[in-house]
Amino acid sequence: MHMAIGLVGRKCGMTRIFTDAGVSVPVTVIEVDPNRITQIKTLETDGYQAVQVTTGERRESRVTNAQKGHFAKAGVAAGRLVKEFRVTEAELEGREVGGTIGVDLFTVGQIVDVTGQSKGKGFQGGVKRWNFRTQDATHGNSVSHRVLGSTGQNQTPGRVFKGKKMAGHLGDERVTVQGLEIVSVDTERSVLVVKGAIPGATGGDVIVRPTIKA
């Protein structure tokens, strides 16, 4: 299990920066509003250790009474989401309910994992969804250029096995990209810049954590 405190941010989009040698490096900009600590869970009271945070804003009319009570107890403003990070005893030191966690949690050159919700593509065929090769363009092939082809064997087993790769819904699922390097940490603007691409559409929420494969 990933036992490390992280941050919840928002994907701003991609750009590029140039190194001193003039090499173009593709980067993604992540805006990180202060993560407000709403609850600290301990082994004694909850059976596990975690730091629960919220970020952003939410209209009061969109907040349930249970959520209002939870945020009020912590003394923080209601956020657009709530996220927990499982942590060790050492990482709980200095953390208190009502406090904040910012981009200074990370340093330039640190390797991180970024989790987000991938872009939804809707219902897609086997060629796009699973990288199947297409059938013959000619030689007697009619209206079957992108169809799957055979999906089973013969009378035995006489069925299609579960999990067979077929056309279906693509994207809109939780995806983690591992091993991304932090290129810049801007504490004034509360912005992280990481090397490479991260999952999701512009404006989507992402979770940034120290890499699990250190």
Curated annotation (Swiss-Prot):
PROSITE patterns: RIBOSOMAL_L3. Methylated by PrmB. One of its GO terms (molecular function) is rRNA binding. Keywords: Methylation, Ribonucleoprotein, Ribosomal protein, RNA-binding, rRNA-binding. GO terms for biological process: translation. It comes from the Bacteria. The modification N5-methylglutamine is found at residue 155. GO terms for cellular component: cytosolic large ribosomal subunit. Part of the 50S ribosomal subunit. Forms a cluster with proteins L14 and L19. Belongs to the universal ribosomal protein uL3 family. One of the primary rRNA binding proteins, it binds directly near the 3'-end of the 23S rRNA, where it nucleates assembly of the 50S subunit. PANTHER family: 50S RIBOSOMAL PROTEIN L3, LARGE RIBOSOMAL SUBUNIT PROTEIN UL3C. This is Large ribosomal subunit protein uL3. It comes from Acinetobacter baumannii (strain ACICU). The lineage of its organism: Bacteria, Pseudomonadati, Pseudomonadota, Gammaproteobacteria, Moraxellales. The gene is rplC.
